[in-house]
Regions:
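Generic marker of residues within folded, mature protein domains
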Residues: 10, 24-26, 71
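Short acidic, Pro/Gly- and aromatic-enriched capping/linker segments at domain boundaries
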Residues: 11-23
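Short, surface-exposed, charged amphipathic helix/loop patches that serve as local interaction elements
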Residues: 28-139
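Short, intrinsically disordered N-terminal pre-domain segments
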Residues: 1-14
Length: 139
């Protein structure tokens, strides 16, 4: 049974953390995490409309591997990136700015592939509200 009053979707617009699967050759043991919004978030919906306009303007389809298609993809997923942890450049912490996010996603396709898969998975953003004695189903 699904009780609609027990569904917590606040993470859709507040974000949820992806722990990035770092290739073994690059993994130093410190986790890399990216906080992302869902495809159901207000920001994604707005950015997706712009993404579709860009693709239509250039007569491209979703997943197009042309330069314009890849840039549109990077901008779309940069929009839903809120923060990150464990990302360094030259040994120093690298701030999570839109410019840096775009640079990371454009140069490291293994990262954007994980971001893309994460934001479309509802389970990453939907949880059950804690049950109180009044809301617990009877045994």
């Amino acid at each position: 049974m699904l009780d609609l009053d027990q569904i917590d979707t606040t993470a859709v617009n507040a974000g949820s953390w992806l722990t990035v699967d770092v290739p073994p050759a690059l993994d130093d043991g410190a986790p890399m995490r990216i906080k992302l919004l869902s495809i159901d978030s207000d920001a994604y919906i707005k950015a997706a409309a712009e993404y579709r306009r860009t693709l239509a303007k250039h007569k491209l389809t979703v997943g197009d591997e042309s330069q314009v298609g890849r840039e549109a993809d990077v901008l779309l997923y940069a929009t839903v990136t809120l923060a990150w942890e464990g990302v360094t450049k030259g040994g120093a912490s690298w701030p999570c700015s839109r410019e840096n996010v775009c640079r990371l996603y454009a140069t490291q396709p293994w990262v954007i592939r994980q971001v893309r898969a994460f934001v479309v998975t509802d389970a990453n953003f939907i949880q059950a509200l804690p049950q109180t004695p009044e809301t617990r189903p009877e045994s």
